[in-house]
Amino acid sequence: MVDMDRISISLPTNLLAEFDEIIEERGYASRSEAIRDSIRDYLIKHKWIHSLEGDRAGTISIIYDHHSTDVMEKLTNIQHDYEKLIVATIHMHLDHDHCMEVVLVKGDASEIKELTDKLTSQKGVKQVKLTVMVPGGNIPQ
């Protein structure tokens, strides 16, 4: 039998309600099982991102609440710290409260991961997705 630890978490009501809908839709026996699956997926994603090496090109997509204190300024300052990686950015207004930025990057994978981690950890950032590819000449044949 696997050792289990009991934990407690606080979630916004709407986030939990949406999660519960998915639990029911997918037929999970319990919230605990769904949370375990979600944590496993997160760990797999984390390991994949942190195993990347070499020269890469890709996008970092960021959704944030632009009303959150200084989030736009913090994101801009972080991007300026990594200007050698950033090829271009696209900014889009999603609704009255939220914006999306897509940052095109090219450079060393470890630096791209570092930039992604810094953007992800900012208060007001709701979601970050890193997509990377091997630049043209480096694609295995």
Swiss-Prot record:
Cofactor entry: Ni(2+)
SUPFAM superfamilies in the cross-refs: ACT-like (SSF55021), Ribbon-helix-helix (SSF47598)
Family: Belongs to the transcriptional regulatory CopG/NikR family.
Coiled coil: none
Keyword terms: DNA-binding, Metal-binding, Nickel, Transcription, Transcription regulation
Its biological purpose: Transcriptional regulator.
Annotated protein name in UniProt: Putative nickel-responsive regulator
Molecular function terms, GO-annotated: DNA binding; DNA-binding transcription factor activity; nickel cation binding
Cofactor binding: number and manner: Binds 1 nickel ion per subunit.
GO biological process: response to nickel cation
Binding of Ni(2+), residues: H80, H91, H93, C99
InterPro entries from the UniProt entry: Acetolactate_synth/TF_NikR_C (IPR027271), ACT-like_dom_sf (IPR045865), Arc_rbn_hlx_hlx (IPR013321), CopG (IPR002145), CopG/NikR_regulator (IPR050192), Ni_resp_reg_NikR (IPR022988), Ribbon_hlx_hlx (IPR010985), TF_NikR_Ni-bd_C (IPR014864)
Pfam families per record: NikR_C (PF08753), RHH_1 (PF01402)
Superkingdom of the source species: Archaea
Organism: Methanococcus maripaludis (strain C5 / ATCC BAA-1333)
